[in-house]
């Protein structure tokens, strides 16, 4: 299945490139220092040392030219750890397969859901049991596959 590219979406060349919705872009890159590891289970002695540096763009975006950001509204994907106000990174160059979280236009409405395929039947499934599965009546266009979620805690 070919992934149509929505006309209003533009590739954002850098992960933190400003507001996708407003079209503003800031094209600075930075590398963040990796200072070691932290135990998320039982406490361990703390040691800090410079281990490496990394670019969040390189870590989170595999296909820069085909990727863009969307800000999440609604709570249908909270069971997948995607919360309102999160940013999702979408790769419109990936072929969507069953089980992927996709951005889809279904019967004229945009949504983010799990893609489920069984033979010729396609269903979009929320990660929140309060929402019913969506079975396209007329048309389904997959705009891209969600590849990462970005959340700011403060």
List the predicted regions and their residue ranges.
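Structural motif
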Residues: 85-86, 100
């Amino acid at each position: 299945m070919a992934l149509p590219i929505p006309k209003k979406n533009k590739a954002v060349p850098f992960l933190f490139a400003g507001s996708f919705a407003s079209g503003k872009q800031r094209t600075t890159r930075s590398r963040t220092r990796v200072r070691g590891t932290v135990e998320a289970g039982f406490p361990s002695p703390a040691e800090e040392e410079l281990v490496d540096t990394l670019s969040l763009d390189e870590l989170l975006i595999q296909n820069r030219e085909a990727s863009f950001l969307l800000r999440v509204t609604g709570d249908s994907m909270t069971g997948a750890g995607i919360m309102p106000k999160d940013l999702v990174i979408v790769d419109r160059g990936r072929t969507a397969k069953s089980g992927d979280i996709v951005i889809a236009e279904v019967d004229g409405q945009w949504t983010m859901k799990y893609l489920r395929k069984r033979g010729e039947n396609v269903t979009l499934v929320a990660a929140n049991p309060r929402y019913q599965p969506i079975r396209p009546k007329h048309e389904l266009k997959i705009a891209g596959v969600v590849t990462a979620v970005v959340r700011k805690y403060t």
